[in-house]
Amino acid sequence: ASDVYKRQLEYIPKVRRLVFEGKYLEAQTLATEKVMAKTNSGMPYQSFGDLHISFPGHTRYSDYYRELSLDSARTIVRYKVDGVTYQRETLTSFADQVVMVRLTASQPGKITCNANLTTPHQDVMVATEGEEVTLSGVSSWHEGLKGKVEFQGRMTARTQGGTRSCRDGVLSIEGADEAVIYISIATNFTNYKDITGNQVERAKNYLRRAVSKDYMTSRKAHVDFFKQYMDRVSLDLGIDKYAGVTTDMRVQNFKETKDDFLVATYFRFGRYLLICSSQPGGQPANLQGIWNDKLFPSWDSKYTCNINVEMNYWPAEVTNLSELHEPLIQLIREVSETGRESAKIMYGADGWVLHHNTDIWRVTGAIDKAPSGLWPTGGAWLCRHLWERYLYTGDMEFLRSAYPIMKEAGKFFDEIMVKEPLHNWLVVCPSNSPENTHAGSNGKATTAAGCTLDNQLIFDLWNQIITTARLLGTDAEFATRLEQRLKEMAPMQIGRWGQLQEWMMDWDNPQDVHRHVSHLYGLFPGNQISPYRTPELFDAARTSLIHRGDPSTGWSMGWKVCLWARLLDGDHAYKLITDQLTLVRNEKKKGGTYPNLFDAHPPFQIDGNFGCTAGIVEMLMQSHDGFIYLLPALPAQWKEGSVNGIIARGGFELDLSWKNGKVSRLVVKSRHGGNCRLRSLNPLAGKGLRKAKGENPNKLYAIPEILQPIINKEAKLNKVELKKTYLYDLETKAGEEYIFLGK
């Protein structure tokens, strides 16, 4: 069902007029009543159900142990009953697309259990087909819309010794030496336009292919598939001093122990989560990745586009998982198609638009209520991922395919942006600085014009279009037009208390500790704010972040790790990691980390895991400011360590070791050739290094010049003190490796 309707076009100008008249709450109220979607806010991501395995006589047990292996993507549960050790090994096979549960015991003939499938869905049927149990159904209704995803799960087993049988939806195993339970799940979903797939045949084929193989062969295929991604990167922050301590207690004790092996594990866990939740050909990681046990999860576990889904993919390129970016890129392709209807019907504009949320059906209209949903710049933020993919890979064919998407997003803003009456700046209106109320409405409304995030996003998007058009030798007239339009936009502003303004007006409250820090997009993930190029804005961003505070929702703290790293303050970034690694055992506490290392908003949101994973790399290496900065935000806690396999823009793979806080060894592997500019806090020695001069000739490191910021006369700015560094150029050849030692 569409989430746009024709009368929205009639009311958006009325909302805009109220904003320009300073009647922000009236504008927001009108938008909620007349502009926001009435019948469809997107469909939820839903759980299939549960596997239950009961073991008669296992109520009294000892030596209980469980683990998740980040080396092999398997879980192990082990315990003893009456002197017998039982083990349950579970994996969800990348290679075979089935769940496998292997049951073993230390004595023969001891595996006896009953297994069944249950689901919270209502429209379901459980059946037995020979040696298979099936659970079939259809996704649930939501907000008056009928679920249309038909699904089937199939379960069977293979045993060594003993007997097995299926009856009344229960799989029974008795007296086996070993058993493997197999579960396949399939749906009729092919893509957002096609649900004609045959879920029954798909589930049958997955299951029958899997059971035809030896378990150990299947396990090896799964582990090999996983390791091709996981083993690309390693992080060493020291020995494991607490190997015998359970994960929840390690998190609970982190503030006292400074358990940096846990930090390295948390980093690895972030990569594990992306590998498992974002495989090419599938859907992108949503608010909970793929790990949702409810029919109606918080925020429907969809794709929130005003920070969250973007944060999910911050680690993709930099931690050497570029292929796993593809599901998000495919989503961007698809919302650029569905977003045409929203642009035309809601705004009367060409191009495409995405507001703050989408789902598997790629809705793009303004959903929920105006305080969050009236934000039309989601497409601009997503387009940054197309650009970043190009910067990391240098893939011109990819850029050529992405350019029409970027161009049409840019065309939409070219048509809908208007001149505001106070400064005559070109702005987006109506919009909001995501989910944050402002003083112009006495804290009662978010709706505004010319918000800093919008300006930064469109500045980036239009510059990316201009650069790409010239690289491809196309659309010269449109590129020239956008260059002129950029000059008419609102610049960044530094407000009365030295802060980077979040809004066009100086409304920022120094006591505001809102979870979103949207106006700092230009610092991270953007690159408009730099200690070298824009020191005043750099200081203002720091002032804003100090006043925003540290403790917050889990995902907000993950973002702040990245921001403090960009502010070159490793100790403060480490403090945010410490805050994020605060144990949360229930839904009532503030943000932190659950006992299994899932990020706590609360509830669980996966973006915090991914944000912190990216932030740890930002502490060790940055490549956004025209050069590769080695150890830019190394905390005092990490005196010695190494990271291998991380990726800098331009396609440079780095192995980096340090001792006493200084680079000791660096290996640069050049994938595409070109100039590699390095900045280091200590001198480097090695063949090919020369002192850097002028602009970096590598086009993947070019940075557009921003508009001159406006600084309030009352603002008291601090001088940005930069550490002495050494800047080198290295001309590289594709496929070559270069080794340097620190002095």
Give, region by region, the residue ranges found by the protein language model.
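Aromatic-residue-lined binding/catalytic grooves and analogous aromatic/hydrophobic interfacial grooves
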Residues: 2-371, 388-390, 407-410, 421, ...
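Beta-strand segments within the central parallel beta-sheet cores of soluble alpha/beta enzyme folds
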Residues: 114-116, 327-330, 345-346, 398-408, ...
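C-terminal catalytic domain of Rieske-type non-heme iron oxygenases
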Residues: 289, 293, 426-428, 435-436, ...
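Well-ordered alpha-helical segments within folded domains of soluble proteins
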Residues: 307-317, 376-387, 453-463, 518-527, ...
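Extended, hydrophobic alpha-helical segments in both membrane/secreted and soluble proteins
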Residues: 308, 375-389, 398-415, 556, ...
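Long alpha-helical scaffolds in large eukaryotic adaptor/regulatory proteins
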Residues: 393, 469-472, 571, 623, ...
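Acidic/histidine-rich catalytic neighborhood
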Residues: 408-468
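Acidic, turn-prone loop/beta-hairpin segments
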Residues: 599, 606, 620, 625-648
